[in-house]
């Protein structure tokens, strides 16, 4: 018999008063969970339906759009549009903001940022993928939304999370009071609390980086990966694990202890990952779990977004590992 808490029960317990709920970002969670459930179903039968492969067009990132990218994007937009408190969305798949509810009668208090399907290039080979999202509170919900409202620092987030679609589907999020993980029961289409108050180890053995870029990355990164390859008494001190799926690599490292690095390269001098809807939300999650997130020299959450699709380098994971990597960057 089930004894754990459902997502709906968790939301109710988090906002015991109606007035508190009206201003709390968790009121978007039901729509997020609904979209995640729908996308999870589609991913699970992707090989049996005509939804694998490319659409043939290119998104604002210069990336080939997958059929599932578009499905995921549309699914989350449609779900969130039903919540009058979501004023506008920034998505990896759209060049400009998507305005939903920004009139005074709609009370659109929140701004939603998302990568609707991170790692979608892995879908065709059945590797874990995910959705990353972030929520900010508007300073004035009586005005029309402009893209400048999204030019914020990550430390202004009021909710951040991700959904990982793998052997099971999990929703992991924070509102600033720790990190909690919920696993989807597909038989009831309900998320249940399975990983309460997640804490990441202060140190770890896993390092996740695309070492195929070794000749393209800064010297500090090369020196750090060489350090990770060192042995002690004939045994390795670290182990390399890189799936090429940000959510999957991050999720494993947060639970087991490790570091994920996507640095600048000569081909991507500003980094590859997007600040607003990839790096900032994961940075807040890892900090809430006791870890650290950096661009190699400073805190990710202190960076102010200057462009909707701004890219930054990312060093994220167990605090001691991130600090060690930062030291190598400073020394080289």
Language-model features, listed with the residues they occupy:
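IMPase-like, lithium-sensitive Mg2+-dependent phosphomonoesterase catalytic core
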Residues: 1-50, 57-59, 70-332
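Alpha-helical scaffold segments that form or flank carboxylate-/histidine-based iron centers
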Residues: 63-66
């Amino acid at each position: 018999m089930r004894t754990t808490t459902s997502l709906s029960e968790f939301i109710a317990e988090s906002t015991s008063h109606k007035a508190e709920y009206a201003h709390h970002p968790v009121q978007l969670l039901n729509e997020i969970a609904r979209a995640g459930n729908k996308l999870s179903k589609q991913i699970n039968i992707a090989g049996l339906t005509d939804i694998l492969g490319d659409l043939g067009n290119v998104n604002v990132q210069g990336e080939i759009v997958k059929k599932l990218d578009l499905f995921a994007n549309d699914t989350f937009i449609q779900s969130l549009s039903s919540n009058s408190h979501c004023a506008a969305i920034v998505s990896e798949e759209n060049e400009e903001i998507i305005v939903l509810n920004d009139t005074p009668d709609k009370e659109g208090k929140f701004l939603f940022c998302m990568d609707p399907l991170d790692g979608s290039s892995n879908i065709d080979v059945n590797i874990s993928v995910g959705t990353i999202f972030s929520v900010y509170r508007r300073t004035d919900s009586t005005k029309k939304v402009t893209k400048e409202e999204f030019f914020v620092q990550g430390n202004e987030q009021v909710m951040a999370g991700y959904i990982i679609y793998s052997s099971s589907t999990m929703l992991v999020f924070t509102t600033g009071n720790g990190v909690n993980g919920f696993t989807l029961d597909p038989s009831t289409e309900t998320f249940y609390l399975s990983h309460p108050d997640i804490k990441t180890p202060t140190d770890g053995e896993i390092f996740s980086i695309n070492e195929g870029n070794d000749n393209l990355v800064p010297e500090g990164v090369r020196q750090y990966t060489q350090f990770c390859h060192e042995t002690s008494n004939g045994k390795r001190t670290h182990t390399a694990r890189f799936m090429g799926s940000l959510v999957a690599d991050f999720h494993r490292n947060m639970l087991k202890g490790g570091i994920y690095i996507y640095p600048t390269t000569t081909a991507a001098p500003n980094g590859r990952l997007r600040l607003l809807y990839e790096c900032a939300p994961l940075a807040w999650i890892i900090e809430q779990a006791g870890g650290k997130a950096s661009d190699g020299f400073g805190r990710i959450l202190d960076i102010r977004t200057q462009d909707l699709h701004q890219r930054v380098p990312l060093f994220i994971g167990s605090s001691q590992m991130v600090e060690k990597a930062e030291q190598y960057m400073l020394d080289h």
